[in-house]
Amino acid sequence: MQTRKTGVRAQQADRTRDNILKAAVKVFSKEGFTGGRIEQISTLAKSNDRMIYYYFGSKEKLFISVLEHIYASFNQAEAKLRLDLADPEQALRELVAFIWDYYVRHPEFVTILATENLHQGLHARKSQNLRALSGEAVGVLRPIIEAGQAKGLFRDDICITHAYLMIASLCYFYNSNRHTLSSFLAVDLADKQAKADWLTFISDLALRGLRR
């Protein structure tokens, strides 16, 4: 009986922590790190301030956990991809499409990263897990490039980091700046066709950047 009670308490604790984390993602993505308040998060999580400090220690540590959480969620979604390495060019297109679609479907990912960059990566540097998480993300691209090189399709001098930066930046910049650029360029970048055209463009661009 004691074991069952302990198991139930552990599950309740996990749910409470998860609810707080999800609420923090929503609050920080809307208000930023500076504007996001612990009271807002606890209210949204249907918890209380004391529980946030119990599980996370401080607002800063909670934000670091949020950063780790959004990257881990991205990696988990990316890990579900089933890419056919027999066709490296198509696999690359599918990876670019996944990254693009993820940014579109998860605007909180884009806004929280923008917030952290405003703070010059202060909290990211304090994370003990982000480097490992980045390795997982880049690791999905590596076998695609290696397969393309083995078939003589991709250049042998490709830097994996540069290739990943190219793809991530082409997906991220559009989504993080679409509001201002829509006004500046007098183009509705939120338009469905505009987004589809951009995905085609960046997929072609990524391939041209890697081909021999």
Curated annotation (Swiss-Prot):
It comes from Pseudomonas putida (strain ATCC 47054 / DSM 6125 / CFBP 8728 / NCIMB 11950 / KT2440). It comes from the Bacteria. Residues 37-56 bind DNA. The lineage of its organism: Bacteria, Pseudomonadati, Pseudomonadota, Gammaproteobacteria, Pseudomonadales. Pathway: Cofactor degradation; nicotinate degradation [regulation]. Residues 14-74 form the HTH tetR-type domain. Disruption phenotype: Growth in nicotinate or 6HNA is similar to that of the wild-type strain. Mutant strain shows constitutive levels of nicotinate hydroxylase activity, and these levels are similar to the induced levels detected in the wild-type strain grown in nicotinate. On the contrary, the NicX activity shows the same induction profile than that observed in the parental strain. Transcriptional repressor for the nicAB operon, encoding the upper aerobic nicotinate degradation pathway. Acts under non-induced conditions: repression of the nicAB operon becomes alleviated in presence of either nicotinate or 6-hydroxynicotinate (6HNA). Keywords: Aromatic hydrocarbons catabolism, DNA-binding, Repressor, Transcription, Transcription regulation. Induction: Expressed at a basal level under non-inducing conditions, but expression increases when the cells are grown in nicotinate as sole carbon source. InterPro entries: Homeodomain-like_sf (IPR009057), HTH-type_TetR-like_transc_reg (IPR050109), HTH_TetR (IPR001647), NicS_C (IPR041474), Tet_transcr_reg_TetR-rel_C_sf (IPR036271). GO terms for molecular function: DNA binding. This is HTH-type transcriptional repressor NicS. GO terms for biological process: catabolic process. Signal peptide: none annotated.
